[in-house]
């Protein structure tokens, strides 16, 4: 998701502009990840650095413009993350045009800043993260979304979109990427800008129980020449997922949160890795998280211990499967705007990585990480 916070400057009764910023930085120590191969790595990283700009030109016309760092030290490490013209009419139909989040699972629509844990998405990435140029970064693409609520009580929501998808490669016909998401709020309705989501409201959103279904499809999105120089037939990408979020405030003031997701990717007969640019995942993926926000403050914040498990079951063979156990604690100072996270991880996600499902190698390793997040 994207923030709509910071300083707001009112021009008149209908026109305004706001500016904000967000930073996420971390330290990680991973077993056997040092260049020597048998020592722990020790790495500081700037994971995200964003500038937010939002505004309204007319009561029905808004815009959103956000920048991001690509986590490098090059001179051109900032790029346009979002550039959206928003035409918002009523609860039923609203239209966003430009570079924006493609409809997908909750983890992707949360983005890093509105997830319940510091490392926000451990399951394989959808097709919208495989695009060309900067439009393929962080789940964005250039296109159009239509979103709204299908019921008067706003419990049933939807978003559907059409995007560039993968440009070039095997897609000689320049096919578009089609995406959609529908969700139902069984209890209180989640309140987020547009079709964005969050993975926790720290007890301030009421009693939450929401189930969402998302899907993406692009014809001839995969294929090309594999790593051995063999021409592979093109194949269609089909991905879909089901996610659940539950949250409630208990009698003692504590907040219990659970989140889960199932994801399925089909590469249309093209083997994972048999592509000139992609080593995409094909198979089933599962993840689940349970969090408990303790009542009362410790210093300036609250403690939130959690556990999480992720399993990515690659159908090409068990050697490309990977899983991870994670236990950690968040120190919540100001919700998603200021928090510190300490986590321990064990599995082969840190050694095999999250992108290559073709010929990745790695053992189960231990990892300790510390993350800092702040935004305004």
Regions found by a protein language model. Give the residues of each.
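Sec/Tat signal peptide C-region and signal peptidase I cleavage site
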Residues: 1-5
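Outer membrane beta-barrel
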Residues: 6-192, 264, 281-296, 302-325, ...
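Detector for outer-membrane/organellar transmembrane beta-barrel domains
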Residues: 12, 183-315, 323-325
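Extracytoplasmic loops and strand-loop junctions of Gram-negative outer membrane beta-barrel proteins
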Residues: 33-36, 125-130, 223-229, 271-274, ...
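A generic beta-sheet turn/junction motif
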Residues: 153, 251, 298, 333-335, ...
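Outer-membrane beta-barrel "beta-signal"
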Residues: 178-189, 362-376
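C-terminal structured "cap/appendage" subdomains that terminate the fold
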Residues: 322-336
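Predominantly the C-terminal beta-signal and adjacent terminal strand-loop region
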Residues: 336-370
């Amino acid at each position: 998701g994207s923030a709509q916070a910071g300083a707001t400057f009112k021009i008149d009764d209908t026109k305004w502009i706001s500016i904000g910023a967000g930073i996420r930085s971390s330290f990680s120590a991973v077993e056997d990840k040092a260049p020597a191969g048998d020592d722990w790595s020790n790495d500081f990283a700037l994971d995200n650095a964003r500038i937010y700009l939002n505004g309204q030109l007319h009561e029905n016309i808004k815009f959103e413009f956000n920048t991001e760092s690509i986590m490098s030290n090059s001179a051109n490490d900032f790029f346009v993350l979002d550039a959206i013209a928003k035409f918002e009419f009523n609860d039923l139909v609203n239209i966003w045009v430009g570079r924006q989040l493609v409809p997908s699972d909750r983890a992707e629509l949360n983005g890093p800043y509105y997830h319940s844990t510091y490392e926000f998405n451990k399951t394989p990435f959808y097709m919208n993260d495989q695009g060309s140029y900067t439009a393929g970064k962080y789940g964005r693409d250039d296109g159009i979304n239509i979103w709204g609520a299908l019921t008067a009580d706003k419990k049933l929501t939807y978003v559907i979109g059409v995007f560039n998808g993968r440009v070039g490669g095997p897609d000689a016909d320049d096919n578009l990427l089609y995406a959609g998401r529908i969700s139902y709020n069984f209890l209180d309705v989640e309140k987020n800008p547009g079709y964005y989501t969050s993975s926790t409201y720290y007890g301030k959103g009421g009693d939450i129980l929401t189930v969402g279904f998302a899907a993406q499809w692009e014809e001839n999105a995969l294929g090309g020449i594999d790593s051995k120089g063999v021409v592979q037939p093109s194949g269609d990408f089909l991905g879909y997922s089901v996610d659940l979020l539950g949250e409630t405030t208990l009698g003692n003031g504590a907040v219990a949160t659970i989140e889960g997701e199932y994801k399925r990717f089909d590469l249309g007969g093209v083997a994972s890795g048999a592509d000139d640019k992609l080593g995409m995942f094909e198979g089933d993926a599962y993840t689940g998280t349970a969090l408990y926000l303790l009542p009362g403050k410790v210093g300036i914040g609250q403690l939130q211990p959690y556990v999480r498990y992720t399993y990515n079951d690659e159908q090409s063979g068990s050697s490309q499967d990977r899983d991870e156990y994670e236990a950690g604690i968040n120190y919540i100072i100001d919700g998603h705007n200021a928090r510190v996270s300490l986590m321990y991880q064990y599995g082969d996600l840190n050694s095999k990585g999250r992108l290559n499902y073709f010929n990745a190698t790695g053992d189960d390793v231990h990892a300790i990480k510390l993350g800092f997040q702040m935004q305004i």
